[in-house]
Amino acid sequence: NMRNINIPRNLGIPTPMGHELLCKCLSDNWNQITEYFKQKTSGQSMIISRIHIRKMRDTNALFEMNYKNWRFDGTPEPDIYIGKKYMVHADISKCFPSIYTHAISWALAGKTEAKCHVHDENLWYNRIDHFTQYSKNGETHGLLIGPHTSNILSEIILCAIDENLTKKYKCYIRNIDDYICYTDSREEAEQFLTDLNRELREFDLLMNHKKTEILELPLCVVETWIHKIQNQTSTLQKAKDYVDYKEIQAYIDFTIRLISKS
């Protein structure tokens, strides 16, 4: 799977029986999990995690990574960047492949308690850890990219990090492992990165420094390349009722050139 141009992303296929047992374990402990999420997010003035699994409206589907319905999900960015001077962009380095399964217990029970009872398989959070390993042939490092179970498990850890960050920072959002924070000064922006890095290290995660940047505001909400494609599309649509092959080919070539430059 190619998430970005020339950047491969390996999708994982779980051990079938192991994945079934993990799903059952999550189902059996769903009340504790939802209560955990409620506790971790109750103090948020807005939903920090913008992309997460949630029950779908008006459908029998159990889950979907749906975050496009602004009527229900809201769009907090216009409110939180007003008056701010800087935008911080940070990313977790190899987030899913780097997650240590024991860190799930650290988040659910607290690091000290989880380490004291690491071998007690009667504890619900240790069972989640155990079956997470089992779905990946007993490995303790890494969540598979693809299964919804991985999104639930990663949110357990990332929501614990959010809980600590929101005590100090109110104007930031997170798209899975991608953070955007708006600040009043460059010093505050740099401090956010320091604090984020410290919180990530508590769960053996690292920032991707190649994607870390501090930008001075204001900035365009929509990237320039998107505007160019929209303008090109508008020109095609207004020309006539149909588009011939040469125009389509020229449009595709134009788009490919933009991709190669981005």
Predicted regions and their residues:
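Active-site palm subdomain of RNA-directed nucleic acid polymerases
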Residues: C116-H117, I152-D177, C181-D184, A189
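Catalytic palm subdomain of template-directed nucleic-acid polymerases
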Residues: A103, L108, I180-E199
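Short, glycine/acidic-rich hinge or "gate" loops at secondary-structure transitions
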Residues: Q39-G43, C116-N122, Y172-N175, T183, ...
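Hydrophobic (often cysteine-bearing) scaffold residues that line and stabilize catalytic clefts
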Residues: G18, F96, S150-I157
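C-terminal polymerase-core module
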Residues: E190-S262
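Short, flexible loop/turn elements at secondary-structure junctions
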Residues: I92-F96, T183-S185, I214, P218
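Short, well-ordered loop/turn elements at secondary-structure boundaries
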Residues: Y81-K84, H148, K167, N175-I176, ...
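Conserved two-metal-ion catalytic palm core of "right-hand" nucleic acid polymerases
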Residues: N1-I145
